[in-house]
Design a protein with these regions (language model features):
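Radical SAM [4Fe-4S] cluster-binding motif and immediate context
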Residues: 145-197
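Glycine-rich beta-alpha loop elements in corrinoid/cobalamin-binding modules
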Residues: 30, 34-143
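Short glycine-rich His-centered loop
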Residues: 2-25, 79
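N-terminal [4Fe-4S]-dependent radical SAM core
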Residues: 14, 124-163
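Alpha-helix N-cap and loop-to-helix initiation/capping positions
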Residues: 22-26, 69, 109, 113, ...
Length: 197
């Protein structure tokens, strides 16, 4: 039986400024990677609230990403899903930094890099026993897949390609080392060029 996954990039409509302007929005690469890692028996839909507001639909699973700026809206969407009996999973920077907070709103939290843990979560979900918390680890660069861009149906002005992860600097104001570690990891240049084409 086919299953349906809805991936949502929430936008906090109460905030003003560039973060809510479609002309400055960018593709959420993390959700594109999740789409790449999701097996073919799942139908995938994607909503970016910079362009289109979330509305409840018949899906098996809703996946949310989160920066701190949009976490309140992500929690709002999760609450709507819960009211309608839809299972929610949340990842991204905010959920990774504050997993206990996120757990108060969603069914499952995935913290850290998701490449190695998303397939495990999906297997558990399909078996009917998903965990409440999964901790991802630093993904070897050769296992970082290309972003599945066909799900991005909106007229993004900006496009991104992730060429590396991690940073050795550990600046106080930055979350990169907490999320991706202090080891700087570069993707293979041929793989990056292939993705750009």
């Amino acid at each position: 039986k086919r299953k349906k996954l809805l991936l949502v990039n929430p936008v906090n409509r109460e905030s003003a400024g560039l973060v809510n302007d479609p002309s400055t929005s960018f593709m959420p690469l993390g959700l594109g990677i999740i789409a790449t890692l999701t097996p073919d028996h799942w139908d995938i839909e994607f909503i970016d609230e910079s362009f289109e507001q979330f509305s409840v639909s018949r899906v098996d699973l809703v996946g949310l990403t989160s920066f701190t700026s949009n976490a309140p809206r992500a929690y709002e969407i999760a609450s709507i899903c819960r009211e309608n009996g839809i299972y929610t999973v949340m990842g991204g920077v905010h959920a990774s930094m504050l997993p206990e907070e996120a757990k108060g709103y969603v069914d499952t939290v995935i913290a850290g890099e998701a490449e190695l843990i998303w397939p495990v979560f999906l297997c558990d979900f399909e078996a009917g026993n998903p965990g409440q918390f999964y901790q991802g680890s630093a993904t070897p660069v050769e296992l970082i897949p290309q972003v599945r861009r066909d799900i991005f149906k909106y007229p993004y002005v900006n496009d991104l390609v992730q060429t590396s992860r991690g940073c050795p600097m550990g600046c106080d104001f930055c979350s990169v080392t907490q999320l991706c570690g202090k080891q700087y990891r570069e993707r293979d240049i041929e793989d990056v060029l292939d993705e750009m084409e």
